[in-house]
């Protein structure tokens, strides 16, 4: 990957000039009644992406695609898919795409076809899932497994939890639990719900040394042994998603039940790997494979579709337009599907940990905005919480609205009511309500304007708020896999254009280092003076109150 400062490209400077045209969404629709047809794309006739409600025209898109060309997005894409070590700061390839490479075409890293190992781990996962789900695998008292607890953090938790929640309509009889926080409350509340005789723990840590994960795993291990009274029970109730065979065996786990993944799998892209074992146990391996199929189909689309029809590329470029030229600082992801209630949180990590960087690939501080803040909640809950600010606040917040045409729970008229809100919100954000319309509504209600002249400004909506509408035929393992991969590739494209390394996360390290230094200070009764006055004061008050 080349070091290309995007602000030095012809396209970037042309976009700066183009911004002065002050395009507005209502104006663009007035000029082109068939705008929807020209500014929407379809994937496999199962996903429709409508980006027409953005302040863009064909000239905007042409310049944005030229920016992608000047920043060599296509060659960077080939480099990633081909196993080149594009994660330069860690000297690693980036191959989450290989994990779902259903075509099974060879992918080489250091002259070795990684697909052989990928397929071997998938086969091992399949056999394990079949034994647990069928009841062949039993706990230390001979009872079948009923509950599965995934112990991980970050990508080892967010992805599996999001997907198992999103695909709950496909779940089997196993009850899934997820523990991530080192706060003892999280593991304690989970253990209170389950039976040690029928619980399986998945410990997800590549190194098997992650502080939060191993703290929780050791507490779970002790909880099991308090009942079982026999160390051999650990091997029947714990498996490892790890590469550290020595530590796994030391813990008491049979290394035959250690599921490997590789250093070219980033945590926030790892749900496709052995880290997804909890997903496969929850929905069955056949459905897990369909999840991989959907992601692979989107991978092929991203790799092969021309720029004009390329969904991840288009979404990435529109995001850059809103972020770097129109001044948006955040993006909201708003799924109108309760099963997707963790989707925004998942891509909060996916985007902000990937592109929240201020150092370019040239090692210098950038002088432009990089990744946006990502946030969101399911509709319609958000409408009664933060939509007020999106509609009438002073910040520009582009939104992605996601909804299924078909619901898994067709109860009464719930779904039409939900979708009516989905459609209404993007229309309201785009077109707003003028002063004249507000006044006319008062007149039609029999109220004179003299009575309400002071109220009218508060009921005006300026509109011109950008949104993407992503309509899915139905949330299935296939369409969910495609949606996740779509956002992954959007993030990748933006990172290439931002000229940053999207696949490291050095920003998480400093806090961990300082926490390791502070921990011993919390275990004695001495007054602490080794930090700044604020940190000293907080630690000393904690020590006083914990007595």
From Swiss-Prot:
Keywords: Cytoplasm, Gluconeogenesis, Glycolysis, Isomerase. Disulfide bonds: none annotated. Its EC number is 5.3.1.9. PROSITE patterns: P_GLUCOSE_ISOMERASE_1 (PS00765), P_GLUCOSE_ISOMERASE_2 (PS00174), P_GLUCOSE_ISOMERASE_3 (PS51463). The keyword Cytoplasm applies. It is found in: Cytoplasm. Its main location: cytoplasm. It is an enzyme of class 5 (isomerase). GO terms for molecular function: carbohydrate derivative binding; glucose-6-phosphate isomerase activity; monosaccharide binding. Pathway: Carbohydrate biosynthesis; gluconeogenesis; Carbohydrate degradation; glycolysis; D-glyceraldehyde 3-phosphate and glycerone phosphate from D-glucose: step 2/4. Transmembrane segments: none annotated. Pfam families: PGI. GO terms for biological process: gluconeogenesis; glucose 6-phosphate metabolic process; glycolytic process. One of its GO terms (cellular component) is cytosol. Belongs to the GPI family. NCBIfam families: PRK00179.1 (NF001211). HAMAP family: G6P_isomerase. Catalyzes the reversible isomerization of glucose-6-phosphate to fructose-6-phosphate. This is Glucose-6-phosphate isomerase. It comes from Glaesserella parasuis serovar 5 (strain SH0165) (Haemophilus parasuis). The gene is pgi.
